C-alpha cells in the first residue's frame, strides 16, 4: 500500500484501542539497486570489505562507526514514530550489533554498543512513551537497563528461549512430555535478569 494508507491503518488501530509496533532493522540493508549499497559509487553506509561488510543473509551491514550512518538510522526511526504515530519499535537482530556478525567468539562490537545506547536515549528523549523492544538471543547483560545505569536502554527484550522451549515441548509426543517439563520452567531461571516480553516470533512459527 501507499504511505497514506499505512498512516490510516495505524490511525484505525489506535481508534480501536490497539497499539502498533514498527519492525525496525538497523543492522543491515538490501543490496537491490534502489537501496543504499554503493550509494554514490562508494561504500557510504556499509563497510568496504566482505568480512565485516556482508551479513549471513548476503545483505550489507551498516557501518555504525560513522556518525552520518548513526544519524541516518536515528532520524529514520524518529520519522516512523513522529509521522506515522507508531507506538514503538521492535529492533531486529540486536545480537548482530552486540557481537561482530552475531558471533560471540569475535567479541563485543563496542562501536555498535555505543550506537544502541545513543539511539535509544535519543528516541526516549523525543518520544518518552515509545516502547523499545530488542530481538536478542544472547546473554549480554543490561539490554533492558537504562543507559544511565550502563545498559542499552531498551524497555523490553523478547524471550526467545522461552519461545523455543515452549514450541519444542508441544511438538513432543504426549507420551514423552513428562520428561520435558523443564522446557516449560527453565525460563524462570533467568527471567528476572531482564524485562522480558513473551512472544511467538514470526521467524519461527512460519516453520510450524
Residue ranges and their predicted role:
Residues 1-86, 90-108:
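Substrate-binding/active-site clefts of carbohydrate-active enzymes
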Residues 85-87, 99-208:
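Conserved alpha/beta catalytic core and glycan-binding cleft of carbohydrate-active enzymes
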Amino acid at each position: 500500500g501507499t504511505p497514506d494508507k499505512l498512516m490510516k491503518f495505524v490511525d484505525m488501530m489506535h481508534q480501536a484501542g490497539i497499539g502498533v509496533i514498527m519492525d525496525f532493522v538497523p543492522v543491515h540493508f538490501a543490496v537491490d539497486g534502489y537501496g543504499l549499497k554503493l550509494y554514490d559509487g562508494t561504500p557510504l553506509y556499509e563497510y568496504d570489505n566482505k568480512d565485516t561488510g556482508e551479513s549471513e543473509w548476503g545483505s550489507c551491514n551498516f557501518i555504525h562507526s560513522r556518525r552520518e550512518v548513526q544519524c541516518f538510522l536515528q532520524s529514520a526511526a524518529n520519522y516512523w514514530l513522529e509521522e506515522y504515530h507508531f507506538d514503538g519499535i521492535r529492533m531486529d537482530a540486536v545480537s548482530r550489533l552486540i557481537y561482530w556478525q552475531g558471533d560471540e567468539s569475535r567479541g563485543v562490537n563496542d562501536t555498535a554498543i555505543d550506537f544502541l545506547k545513543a539511539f535509544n536515549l535519543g528516541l526516549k528523549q523525543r518520544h518518552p512513551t515509545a516502547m523499545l523492544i530488542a530481538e536478542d538471543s544472547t546473554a549480554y547483560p543490561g539490554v533492558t537497563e537504562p543507559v544511565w545505569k550502563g545498559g542499552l536502554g531498551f524497555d523490553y527484550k523478547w524471550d526467545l528461549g522461552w519461545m523455543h522451549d515452549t514450541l519444542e515441548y508441544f511438538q513432543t509426543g504426549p507420551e514423552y512430555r513428562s520428561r520435558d517439563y523443564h522446557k516449560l520452567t527453565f525460563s524462570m531461571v533467568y527471567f528476572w535478569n531482564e524485562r522480558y516480553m513473551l512472544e511467538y516470533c514470526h521467524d519461527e512459527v512460519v516453520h510450524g
